[in-house]
């Protein structure tokens, strides 16, 4: 297993990942290159934060036979979130003629009981 994150991690965190046989790469997702193929690619709350979401998704679908994705959608651009993600982008990145969808769920998640909410997309898909 491989983890990619641009943030600096504590030695304790690095040790936990190493103990689970996960090789950590400290780099931006756009800069990560691997000739390795993966059974699954997992992405959680990533694409809003990257500089090039198209490049990240191209790498993911090229490298993995199955993807599990959770991303916030329809949120306005702000500091730290240079993109507004839309369902239509995921439809382009994971076209139904190339992918089988075990889960394709778009919804609203309420947070903290204070009325805060966000729209999300959750996908579990495998290449045909």
Language model segments and positions:
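Core SAM-dependent methyltransferase catalytic element
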Residues: 105-128
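Hydrophobic adenine-recognition pocket in adenosine-nucleotide-binding enzymes
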Residues: 46
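Short alpha-helix
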Residues: 81-107
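A conserved beta-strand element that flanks and buttresses the S-adenosyl-L-methionine
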Residues: 42
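Conserved beta-strand signature within the Rossmann-like core of class I S-adenosyl-L-methionine
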Residues: 64-76
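Class I SAM-dependent methyltransferase SAM/SAH-binding core
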Residues: 1-31
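A short, conserved alpha-helix within the catalytic core of class I
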Residues: 49-63
């Amino acid at each position: 297993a491989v983890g990619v994150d641009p943030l600096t991690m504590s030695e304790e965190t690095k040790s936990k990942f190493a103990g689970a046989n996960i090789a950590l790469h400290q780099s931006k997702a756009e800069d990560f290159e691997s000739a390795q193929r993966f059974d699954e690619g997992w992405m959680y709350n990533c694409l809003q934060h990257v500089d090039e979401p198209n490049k990240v998704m191209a790498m993911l679908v090229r490298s993995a036979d199955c993807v599990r994705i959770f991303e916030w959608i329809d949120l306005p651009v702000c500091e730290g979130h240079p993109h507004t993600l839309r369902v239509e982008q995921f439809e382009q990145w994971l076209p139904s003629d190339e992918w089988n969808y075990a889960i394709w769920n778009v919804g609203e998640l309420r947070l903290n009981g204070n009325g805060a909410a966000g729209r999300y997309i959750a996908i579990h898909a495998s290449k045909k």
